[in-house]
Structures are given as structure tokens and as C-alpha cells.
């Protein structure tokens, strides 16, 4: 076993803080409407230019093992905020850095780290409840466009596009982002259906750059059974190979020799196949297979109605213009099913919604209607160069996540104002002892950090602006884009409540653990061993 390097107490914490600061300082230059870009070197191709906090955080690896541990823990904050709400990664990093810096000062001054952490946790729980009371529902198109605009770094066209896409496919509809061909952004609404089942084997992937399987004009085999014996499949595979089209298999499961044979056929290029599990379970799976059959003009091969897989023909297959499968979703675009049949099916499900007794059933039925009737909206991002395209696409993705979060949990005043209002409302909060009170103060002081950083990135004086905003009340704040004070909601500067909440919770979670660190252990770097003298042969 390799020798270990161990650091204790202040030595460990100083190193850890240095790593935290390197990562956070790189990320926080991107915050706010006047945040700057960061250029990331790539081992191949052009460098990537980004203003997305999590993309910057993911690039950072430090040479010093102890500093790197600090950086990696804060990277986790950005990643978690990104997974939960899809945005707010820079805010989360700024909050984490502020809590860690203030917290470690308190530890150095002799406070008990565990009580500090309890105080921080108490403040965050109270702050989350307070955020919920400040939250305003986000339902109209104008508010959705404003949230999208702020999240796309004040790009109004992106905000409007997302609001338009949500109008067309509904708030439950599926919206995807693709590379455009021109200079302008476009919005395409494609009839389609998406369900959460990915490919059964990564060997089906034919677009390695996106990690997806794309099938053009495939046949779609729908089977309400497990397929493990390849002999059942042979007639279908031969017919599809003759037709020269790809095949998508949607079945209860495809396993064993059947899956292995499909993979081998695909890799050898004999027939292009992909297999996914059918969505849902039990009766809901049968119903969803029937939905897909209606959409694609196919028939579900089910032994319950006396159909056997060996006897299936191309007439029983569904068809679609295009199918995209990634590791956890499958999207069927432009199924060839008849409009009348689709509308009939939608009517049938709506009737079931009226008769449904439980909220859960009603919700699942509404999801099915959205998938059958809503379609898929595709935002095509236009740009002059590939570098700009990548940067813009990342921003549109962020904005899309933010608007979904806003529709889900509502919005609060943006520009760091909501956290300042929460902190002032919690100024009377107390813990069980003095050290916990210091922990509460650390968390409340850290809640000013996002506003201060936004102002700093504008080249203004953070303390002056922070004090002016604190002196106001309600949604009164500082518009960093125009450098004016006013009502943030009226000025259209909104943050999704979910994004602000997630940023605060994840920042406090990781920062609290780092404050309570007393010892760090890592491998001793392997030095070059001493050169062995060459053994002479004598004489």
C-alpha cells in the first residue's frame, strides 16, 4: 500500500481553503449580467468559451493533492445544483466559498466546528421556508420569457424563444436544443413522443459525440413480452434487413442471446438495430405501448390477443421519421399514425382522467396526453462560428432548465435580492448556544455574497450597493445591467425559487462538512527513485 501524507488542524484547513478559492475565483467571474467569459483549453479542437459556472468548475484539477480536495468538494456543489435545477451553479459556488471562508475564520477563533455547522444548518432550513413565502407563481408567458432571459445572461431572444416553445407544447411538453444551420435562432415544433427509457446496450450508439443513438425512418417493433430467444426475432430481422431500414425494438425486456445477437448485427453493419425497454409497469406499460402503436401506426405484439413474435410482419411494425435514444430517454419524432386514431386515443385518455380517483393516476394520464398531443419543440441555435455555437447552446440549455424550475416552484426577485431579504428576516434567529449563533451569522452573512459578486463584476463598490439594497424592502434591488435601483420583479429580473433554494442548500451542505474537517489524508506523490548504477561486467 502506498505511503500516505497526513495533515491536521489548521495546516489541513489552510490548504483546503486555498483549493476552494482557486475554483470559486475562476467560477465567480461569470456571475451576473456583466460577468466575464472563461476560456477552456481542449485537448483537441478549438477552445471552448463559456459563462456557465459548472462547465468552468468541471475543468479544474489542481496539482497539490490537498488543495485539489478542497476544489473537488466545491465542484460537487456546482454539479449538484446543476443536476437539481439546471442552473444557479455560480451562485452555489459563491455561497459555498463565503460560508467556508467565514466558517474557517470562526474555527480559527476557537469556535466549536460542530456547533457552527448546526447553526449554519438551522439558518438554511429557516431560509428555505422564508424563500417559499417570498415565491410568486410563474405562469404567464411574459414571466417565463423574463426568467429565460436572465438565465441566458440577459439574451432576450432566448427568453422569448423558450416562452414561445412552452406556449406551443405546453409546460409539460418536451423541449430539446439542437445546433442550427443559419445565424438566427429558430423554433421547430415536431410531433413526437418522449419516454424515460434509454438504450439497453451502449454498443447501439451511432453518434459518439453526443452519446446517442439516432435512427432515420426506422421500423418500430412493439412487443409486450421479454425477448430472450433470438429465433423468435429472426423473421422480423430478415424482413427489416431486406427493406434496408433501421429497426427500433420496444419490449418488456431484451436480454441474453437476443440482445447479444442484435449488438453483433449492429456492430457488423448487417442491420441497424436499437432496443429499449417499454416505459411504465404492469397495466400502465400495456397502455403506453398502445399509445406508441397509435402514434406510429403499428400493432403491439401481445400473446394476450393471440399474436406471436415469429409471425410478425412488416405490416405490424410502426414507423417514424426519426428516433433519438440516449442513456435515459427515447424520443420518437413524426410517427406515421393517422391523426384521427391519435385524436381518438387522446379522447379516450381524457375520459379516463375525468374518472380517475387518485391524483397520481390523474397525473400519469395527463403526462400521456401531453406526450401524444403535445409534440416536441426543437430550439435550433444559430451562430456564426462553432465556438459561439457551443457557448450559446450551453446558455440556452441553462435558460430552459431555469424556466422549467420557475414553472415548478415559482420565482423570487433576482440579482441576489431574495437572499438579502431572507437574511434580514432571520436576523433574530438564535441557536442553542453562542457557537451556533455564530454559525447562523456565518450563513446569513454569506447570503449577501451573490449580490456583492454581481456588483463587483460590474466594477462598482459592493458594500455601497449592498447597504443601499438592505435599506430598501420587498423586491427593491440593484439592476446590474442598467446600474439602476428599483423593483426587481417590475424590471423583469427574476430567479426561479428552486434555483436559489438548491444553490443555498447544496452550498451549505458541503461547506458545513468542510468546516468540520480536522484531518486530510492523501497519497504521497511518487518521486523518481534513485538511479541504480549499471552493473559492470568486470575487466
Swiss-Prot record:
GO MF annotation list: ATP binding; ATP-dependent protein folding chaperone; isomerase activity
Main location: cytoplasm
Annotated compartments: Cytoplasm
UniProt binding sites for ATP: 30-33, 51, 87-91, 415, 479-481, 495
Keyword Signal: no
Enzyme Commission number: 5.6.1.7
Keyword annotations of the record: ATP-binding, Chaperone, Cytoplasm, Isomerase, Nucleotide-binding
Enzyme class: isomerase
Record field: catalytic activity: ATP + H2O + a folded polypeptide = ADP + phosphate + an unfolded polypeptide
Any single GO BP term: protein refolding
Cellular-component GO terms for this entry: cytoplasm
Pfam families xrefs: Cpn60_TCP1
Record-linked PROSITE patterns: CHAPERONINS_CPN60
Assembly notes: Forms a cylinder of 14 subunits composed of two heptameric rings stacked back-to-back. Interacts with the co-chaperonin GroES.
NCBIfam families: GroEL, PRK00013.1, PRK12849.1, PRK12850.1, PRK12851.1
Summary of the function given for this chain in its UniProt record: Together with its co-chaperonin GroES, plays an essential role in assisting protein folding. The GroEL-GroES system forms a nano-cage that allows encapsulation of the non-native substrate proteins and provides a physical environment optimized to promote and accelerate protein folding.
PANTHER family the record matches: 60 KDA HEAT SHOCK PROTEIN, MITOCHONDRIAL (PTHR45633)
Family stated for the protein in its record: Belongs to the chaperonin (HSP60) family.
Protein name as it appears in the record: Chaperonin GroEL
Amino acid at each position: 500500500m502506498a505511503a500516505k501524507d497526513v495533515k491536521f488542524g489548521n495546516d489541513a484547513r489552510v490548504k483546503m481553503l486555498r483549493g476552494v478559492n482557486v475554483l470559486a475565483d475562476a467560477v465567480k467571474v461569470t456571475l451576473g449580467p456583466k460577468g466575464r467569459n472563461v476560456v477552456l483549453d481542449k485537448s483537441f479542437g478549438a477552445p471552448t468559451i463559456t459563462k456557465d459556472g459548472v462547465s468552468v468548475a468541471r475543468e479544474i484539477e489542481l496539482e497539490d493533492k490537498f488543495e485539489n480536495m478542497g476544489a473537488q468538494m466545491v465542484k460537487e456543489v456546482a454539479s449538484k445544483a446543476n443536476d437539481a435545477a439546471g442552473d444557479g451553479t455560480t451562485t452555489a459556488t459563491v455561497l459555498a466559498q463565503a460560508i467556508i471562508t467565514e466558517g474557517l475564520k470562526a474555527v480559527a477563533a476557537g469556535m466549536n466546528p460542530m456547533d457552527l455547522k448546526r447553526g449554519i444548518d438551522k439558518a438554511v432550513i429557516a431560509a428555505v421556508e422564508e424563500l417559499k413565502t417570498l415565491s410568486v407563481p410563474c405562469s404567464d408567458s411574459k414571466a417565463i420569457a423574463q426568467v429565460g432571459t436572465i438565465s441566458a445572461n440577459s439574451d432576450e431572444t432566448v427568453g422569448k424563444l423558450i416562452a414561445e416553445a412552452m406556449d406551443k407544447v405546453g409546460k409539460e411538453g418536451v423541449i430539446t436544443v439542437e445546433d442550427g444551420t443559419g445565424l438566427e435562432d429558430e423554433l421547430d415544433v415536431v410531433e413526437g413522443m418522449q419516454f424515460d427509457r434509454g438504450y439497453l446496450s451502449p454498443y447501439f450508439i451511432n453518434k459518439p459525440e453526443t452519446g446517442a443513438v439516432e435512427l432515420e425512418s426506422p421500423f418500430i417493433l412493439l412487443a409486450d413480452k421479454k425477448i430472450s430467444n433470438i429465433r423468435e426475432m429472426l423473421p422480423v430481422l430478415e424482413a427489416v434487413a431486406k427493406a434496408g431500414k433501421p429497426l427500433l425494438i420496444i419490449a418488456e425486456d431484451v436480454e441474453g442471446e437476443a440482445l447479444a445477437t442484435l449488438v453483433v448485427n449492429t456492430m457488423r453493419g448487417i442491420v441497424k438495430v436499437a432496443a429499449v425497454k417499454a416505459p411504465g409497469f404492469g397495466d400502465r406499460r400495456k397502455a403506453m405501448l398502445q399509445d406508441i402503436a397509435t402514434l406510429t401506426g403499428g400493432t403491439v405484439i401481445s400473446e394476450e390477443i393471440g399474436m406471436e413474435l415469429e409471425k410478425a410482419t412488416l405490416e405490424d411494425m410502426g414507423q417514424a421519421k426519426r428516433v433519438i435514444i440516449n442513456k435515459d430517454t427515447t424520443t420518437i419524432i413524426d410517427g406515421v399514425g393517422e391523426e384521427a386514431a391519435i385524436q381518438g386515443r387522446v379522447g379516450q385518455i381524457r375520459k379516463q382522467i375525468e374518472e380517475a380517483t387518485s391524483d397520481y393516476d390523474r397525473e400519469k394520464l395527463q403526462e400521456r396526453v401531453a406526450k401524444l398531443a403535445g409534440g416536441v419543440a426543437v430550439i435550433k441555435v444559430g451562430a456564426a462560428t462553432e465556438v459561439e455555437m457551443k457557448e450559446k447552446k450551453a446558455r440556452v440549455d441553462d435558460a430552459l432548465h431555469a424556466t422549467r424550475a420557475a414553472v415548478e416552484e415559482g420565482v423570487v426577485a433576482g440579482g441576489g435580492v431574495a437572499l438579502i431579504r431572507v437574511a434580514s428576516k432571520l436576523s433574530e434567529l438564535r441557536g442553542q448556544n453562542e457557537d451556533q449563533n455564530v454559525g447562523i451569522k456565518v450563513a446569513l452573512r454569506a447570503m449577501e455574497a451573490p449580490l456583492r459578486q454581481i456588483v463587483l463584476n460590474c466594477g462598482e463598490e459592493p458594500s455601497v450597493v449592498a447597504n443601499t439594497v438592505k435599506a430598501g424592502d420587498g423586491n427593491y434591488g440593484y439592476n446590474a445591467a442598467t446600474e439602476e435601483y428599483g423593483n426587481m420583479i417590475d424590471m423583469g429580473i427574476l430567479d426561479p425559487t428552486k434555483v436559489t433554494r438548491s444553490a443555498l442548500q447544496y452550498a451549505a451542505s458541503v461547506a458545513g462538512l468542510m468546516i468540520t474537517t480536522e484531518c486530510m489524508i492523501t497519497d504521497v506523490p511518487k518521486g523518481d527513485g534513485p538511479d541504480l548504477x549499471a552493473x559492470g561486467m568486470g575487466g
